[in-house]
Amino acid sequence: MKSLLRPGWALAAGILMWSCSDDSGPRASGGSLAPTPVSAPRRILVVTHTEGFRHSSIPIAEETITALGQRSGLFTTILCRTASDVARMLTPTGLAGVDAIVFANTTGSLPVPDLGAVLRWIEDGHGFAGMHSASDTYHDAPAYLEMLGNEFLTHGDQVTVEALVENSSHPASSPLGTRFRVFDEIYKFTRSNRGGVTMLLSLDRHPADGLPDAGQPGDLPLAWAKSHGRGRVFYTALGHREDVWRNSLYKQHVLGGLQWVLQM
């Protein structure tokens, strides 16, 4: 799949190095830029409701995504936290004026009144970004999983990995160098999805996570971008831990993905 990149992503990466300094993880090199808000910030709906396991990192995820929008000036954030929020906001009426949906560590089958309508909304040219357990959401909805690009299968112990950066020009992966070292819960998926996505991060060996295939050669996707009709989709399997969400490089990874799905 050919990525459609816009030059504006480089500005956001520079802004982030200025605004989201952090002592919990490695930093990207380069100078700093004062924030230059866009003339009309986009609007994203960040969904954190869960119908299954609930990650302790969700409040940090909400805080981080909100801050990325505020400090870059690229987007404003609307939080969708409860079942009643989902039923009200994830509708054609609720999505009026929204440019992208984010599933930040959602789990289970959310009480969306008409999931098909939401998927058509994305297909019509809007954006979708999923973090970590967005792939552990809607196991009973093949159309959602097709839109996302894969389905969570299992994970082992949390472990340090060095993710291979496969695309040096995509805004979600270009700030990460050639490898991204991170300690997190590493997901494994039901299938290989290289044929239908632009792969951004991967592993060429199963992590030493205590599972039977630990340490063996493999091809494990970690982050990708894809189209869905005229819409754009970004997914990263990283983001289980609170300290990952505080990692300055992970923030650039997320911001680049959001800017790409917003077509900025």
Where are the model-predicted features located?
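Catalytic beta-strand/loop cores that center a nucleophilic Ser/Cys/Thr
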Residues: 97, 150, 155-229
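Short, solvent-exposed loop/turn segments at secondary-structure junctions
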Residues: 51-52, 108, 135-137, 204-207, ...
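Extracellular ligand-binding/catalytic regions of CAZymes and related secreted enzymes
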Residues: 28-41, 56-59, 63-72, 81-82, ...
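C-terminal motif of bacterial Sec signal peptides marking the signal peptidase cleavage site
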Residues: 17-19
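A glycine-rich, often tryptophan-bearing local segment used as a flexible ligand/cofactor-contacting loop or short
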Residues: 103, 107-178
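Bacterial lipoprotein signal-peptidase II cleavage site
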Residues: 21-28
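Helical hinge/lid and interdomain linker segments adjacent to catalytic or ligand-binding clefts
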Residues: 30, 34-35, 43-47, 52-137
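Bacterial N-terminal signal peptides that target proteins for export
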Residues: 1-9
